[in-house]
Amino acid sequence: MNKKHFIILLAAIITAYVQCNAQPSKVKTAAKSVFKLTTYKADGSILAESNCIFTDSEGTAISTLTPFIGAAKATITDTRGHQMEVTRMLGANELYNFAKFKTEANKIKPIQIASEPSKPGDAVWIASYGNDKGNPTASTIKSVETFMDKYSYYILNTNASETEPNTCILFNESGKAIGLTKPAKATAGMHAIDANYALSLSTSGFSLNDPVLSQIGIPPALPEKQDQALLMLMIAGQKTDTAQLEAIASDYIKNYPTLIDGYTSLARFYVSRNEFSQAA
């Protein structure tokens, strides 16, 4: 190889490297909106920490499920150190390790979820809370598989040992979240699951009997449909978790103030605690 060809080849390699590692401004901005999720045991000690993102301006967020298992409460910490309490679980899936939940936050600037899947060879960035002041790790998509006919399962050209073992948020070059990473063996490529699947999670009337949600001390949110919400309220009345019943009955009254079911359930709850003035 002569000197001219060597210089051309070297320039091509450098250009490719720079293009791969250069961080678009939208990616750097989005990475600063990755927040810290902290879950706590019943005694107040920390159970686990992970990363999460808000998906709407009303305090809805997604993360992996694992930190919530066995948790009595949870908080989110933003980049300024401000904490927000997780108030309700909006859904969970053990197989794909996803959780969707509601916080007390409002008027939050959410992260946009990519509607189109990324393709093999596409540049992506792996971000976490406090990730070097918004400087995520660059990678590329190695391969993409499809599950449930419409969601993407990504394998990256990045090994688990090259970044933190915690779950991170995966962004495309437009600063849109495409997935949440899964911790993998150090010798294996890092995997990520489509964030759109987390958005699809929801509760049902039978969520109180869900073996996954039953391991979480944070109450589930009422289902959107009234008949399913009533079913959840009825099942809550048969459980021994009085705090959960109080939360569900209060939510039902807030959503359906003209229906008597929530009031009667809450009255029975107060009577069971001999709080007759509250039941009146």
Which stretches of residues belong to each language-model region?
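Bacterial Sec-dependent N-terminal signal peptides
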Residues: 1-25
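Flexible, gly/ser-rich surface segments that form the specificity/activation loops bordering the active-site cleft
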Residues: 23-26, 109-155, 161-165, 181-192
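A conserved glycine-rich beta-strand in the N-terminal activation segment of trypsin-fold
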Residues: 23-24, 40-64, 83-85, 167-168
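C-terminal cap/linker of serine protease catalytic domains
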Residues: 27, 179-248
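Conserved active-site neighborhood of the chymotrypsin/trypsin-like protease fold
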Residues: 56-127, 132-136, 160
